[in-house]
């Protein structure tokens, strides 16, 4: 799954992308419902690895099934 697809689903689930302070290939996300944040790589056209995505969702307090259904 590409970063844009992940970002779209996270927004639908109520997460917010925090403002970028500098250039780089990683973006910080915040889940207001849980108060937790995580960092996701933005690799453009390359797919995110499933383990990386699952770990980020776990840090945000989002279940995998909930994410898939979004």
Which residues fall in each region the model found?
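C-terminal structural segments of small proteins and small subunits
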Residues: 36, 44-70
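Polyanion-binding surface elements
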Residues: 1-14
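A short, structured beta-strand/loop element
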Residues: 17-51
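Alpha-helical interaction segments
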Residues: 5, 17-20, 54-57
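Short amphipathic alpha-helical "recognition" segments used for binding
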Residues: 6-9, 20, 32, 63
């Amino acid at each position: 799954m590409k970063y844009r697809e992940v970002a779209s689903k996270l927004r639908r689930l109520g997460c917010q992308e925090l403002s970028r302070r500098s250039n780089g290939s990683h973006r910080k996300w915040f889940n207001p419902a849980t108060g937790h944040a995580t960092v996701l790589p933005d690799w453009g056209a390359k797919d995110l690895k499933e383990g990386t995505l699952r770990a980020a969702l776990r840090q945000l307090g989002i279940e995998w099934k909930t994410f898939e259904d979004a």
